[in-house]
Amino acid sequence: MTESYFASIAPIEFEGAASENPLAYRYYDKNRVVLGKRMEDHLRMAVCYWHTFCSEGADMFGPGTFHRPWHIGPMDQAHAEHKLNEAFEFFTRLGLPFFCFHDTDVMAEAHTIREHVDNLARIGDRIQEKMAATGVKLLWGTANLFSHPRYMAGAASNPDPDVFRFAATQVRHCMDLTKRLGGQNYVLWGGREGYDSLLNTDLKQEKAQLGRFLKMVIEHKHKIGFSGTILIEPKPHEPTKHQYDFDVETVYSFLVANGLEKEVKLNIEANHATLAGHSFEHEIATAVALGVFGSIDMNRGDPQNGWDTDQFPNDVREITTALYYILLGGGFTTGGNNFDAKVRRQSFEPADLFYAHVGAVDTVAQGLINAAAMIEGGQLAGIVKERYAGWQGELGRAILDGKMSLEALSDGAVAEGITPRPRSGRQEMIENLVGRYL
């Protein structure tokens, strides 16, 4: 057997905060108990297949620089299995419990719809064997409905019903495989479900198609007995000018309009929040408040660039506040932290993939430790509770319970001659408080 591409890298171990080994975890101790649960079980971290094993390091101005062995030659079954073997070598050396994939990431290239179905089933057998041998689990699967030229005008929102049918075929078989592999979620990302120009777009028609597609996905989920969660991943633009799943609020409105808000949750990506003009924690807190928080694509964007840079997370403060709101919402159930991130074009050596993931894992672990301390301290929650205390009183409850009319409120306010006075929001004090946990 040919030596693994990653043979020079030993399994990554926890060595503690004092370690100077760049290929060791300093904060991620998977068995450390945080808020009554093992760190590994809190964070449920996953490696993504696409950026890690499919990216060739190309950009708009130059060709690939990575030259991985599995990038050479036609993407036939032998190459797909070569890539799969290396992927599981990476997963096991990194020691994370989950991975995620698109159908076309893992399978041999297909030239017909029949080949697509057959090739996916064939590689599915090999994936099942590798999972059984290593204990690595599948966080979620998804179908790539954006890369092939057939999807240049969208998949579910495409003007051509045959493209819609092809997309439906991919989703059906990818969900079937996800179920077979014990996947805990199935993701829908509408990379080209949007438009580049309104001049050739029928918005009402396309949104009706999207709604029907999603309903069929839910119907199939129940038909096959898939117990996982269906997730939608919001993104405002790129590759289209405007995407229909713009942000959390937009997706929630779409779900409500189609009566699916109890069936679907959201997979929130940090970089997509940046592109939508939101903070990462805003999108998380909004999803938690609306009851649709599901999972995380953990990465970072660059606020000075207007595109999806998909960098590995390294901002402990941002991750701390993000995880604080996740913990407040009860934490993950079927979801987790998928590292939807890629090494930079100049980082082409095998070790670079490990440096990137080790740093990201430790950043998230630090964030969890800090967020847990904030929860245990209780000061921030206490400040917020006190700020809204009036709504827990008799008047506040009567308003929210629908026992007061606009007229009654107005008459009472005038009769009492109320003179509300502003109260400080204490923003700077609260920011200082959070800083003490970092």
From Swiss-Prot:
<keyword id="KW-0479">Metal-binding</keyword>
<feature type="binding site">
    <location>
        <position position="269"/>
    </location>
    <ligand>
        <name>Mg(2+) 2</name>
    </ligand>
</feature>
<feature type="binding site">
    <location>
        <position position="308"/>
    </location>
    <ligand>
        <name>Mg(2+) 2</name>
    </ligand>
</feature>
<protein>
    <recommendedName>
        <fullName>Xylose isomerase</fullName>
        <ecNumber>5.3.1.5</ecNumber>
    </recommendedName>
</protein>
<keyword id="KW-0963">Cytoplasm</keyword>
<feature type="active site">
    <location>
        <position position="105"/>
    </location>
</feature>
<feature type="binding site">
    <location>
        <position position="310"/>
    </location>
    <ligand>
        <name>Mg(2+) 2</name>
    </ligand>
</feature>
<feature type="binding site">
    <location>
        <position position="272"/>
    </location>
    <ligand>
        <name>Mg(2+) 2</name>
    </ligand>
</feature>
<comment type="subunit">
    <text>Homotetramer.</text>
</comment>
<keyword id="KW-0413">Isomerase</keyword>
<dbReference type="Pfam" id="PF01261">
    <property type="entry name" value="AP_endonuc_2"/>
</dbReference>
<dbReference type="InterPro" id="IPR013022">
    <property type="entry name" value="Xyl_isomerase-like_TIM-brl"/>
</dbReference>
<dbReference type="InterPro" id="IPR001998">
    <property type="entry name" value="Xylose_isomerase"/>
</dbReference>
<dbReference type="InterPro" id="IPR036237">
    <property type="entry name" value="Xyl_isomerase-like_sf"/>
</dbReference>
<keyword id="KW-0460">Magnesium</keyword>
<dbReference type="GO" id="GO:0009045">
    <property type="term" value="F:xylose isomerase activity"/>
</dbReference>
<dbReference type="GO" id="GO:0042732">
    <property type="term" value="P:D-xylose metabolic process"/>
</dbReference>
<dbReference type="GO" id="GO:0005737">
    <property type="term" value="C:cytoplasm"/>
</dbReference>
<keyword id="KW-0859">Xylose metabolism</keyword>
<keyword id="KW-0119">Carbohydrate metabolism</keyword>
<comment type="similarity">
    <text>Belongs to the xylose isomerase family.</text>
</comment>
<dbReference type="GO" id="GO:0000287">
    <property type="term" value="F:magnesium ion binding"/>
</dbReference>
<feature type="binding site">
    <location>
        <position position="297"/>
    </location>
    <ligand>
        <name>Mg(2+) 1</name>
    </ligand>
</feature>
<feature type="binding site">
    <location>
        <position position="340"/>
    </location>
    <ligand>
        <name>Mg(2+) 1</name>
    </ligand>
</feature>
<feature type="binding site">
    <location>
        <position position="269"/>
    </location>
    <ligand>
        <name>Mg(2+) 1</name>
    </ligand>
</feature>
<feature type="active site">
    <location>
        <position position="102"/>
    </location>
</feature>
<feature type="binding site">
    <location>
        <position position="233"/>
    </location>
    <ligand>
        <name>Mg(2+) 1</name>
    </ligand>
</feature>
<dbReference type="InterPro" id="IPR013452">
    <property type="entry name" value="Xylose_isom_bac"/>
</dbReference>
